[in-house]
């Protein structure tokens, strides 16, 4: 059996990460699967990506894709500021930010707005599961 390779001659398995521990059916795993597929199809080198995340269920997802890339899990709502700094000193990396509904639109709304205002060079994915799932008291 011949394995399918992308333009970089990498197997799709080179783009995966660890096994998910998220609740079945929330949708975050499907987002991770689509990130894997897009990065593989577009021939993006995993080592040239920096995954940034905040706090919450969504912040766990970077562990499930692009396992050979760089990553940083930041303080709740503050991921855009950390990404700004990392972006300024690491021009050779592409930044992929993953944040949840609470992390982005609640405590992090100010950070999010300023990242937009600064026109920060990153892909920012908001994963909305509709709850503050990891803090449990909000469910």
Where are these regions (language model features)?
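Active-site diphosphate/adenylate-binding microenvironment
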Residues: 12-75
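Conserved small/polar residues in nucleotide/adenosyl-binding loops
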Residues: 137-139
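Short, charged low-complexity linear segments at domain edges
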Residues: 1-10
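Thiamine diphosphate
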Residues: 55-133
């Amino acid at each position: 059996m011949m394995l399918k390779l992308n333009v970089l001659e990498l197997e799709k398995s080179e783009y995966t990460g660890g096994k998910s521990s998220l609740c079945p059916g929330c949708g975050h795993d499907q987002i991770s699967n689509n990130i894997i597929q897009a990065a593989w199809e577009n021939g993006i080198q995993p080592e040239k990506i920096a995954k940034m995340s905040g706090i919450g269920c969504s912040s766990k997802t970077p562990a499930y894709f692009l396992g050979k890339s760089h990553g940083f899990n930041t303080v709740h709502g503050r991921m855009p500021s950390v990404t700004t700094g990392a972006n300024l000193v690491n021009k050779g990396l592409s930044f992929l930010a993953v944040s949840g509904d609470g992390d982005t639109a609640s405590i992090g709304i100010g950070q999010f707005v300023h990242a937009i205002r600064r026109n920060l060079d990153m892909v920012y994915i908001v994963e909305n599961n509709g709850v503050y799932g990891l803090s449990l008291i909000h469910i």
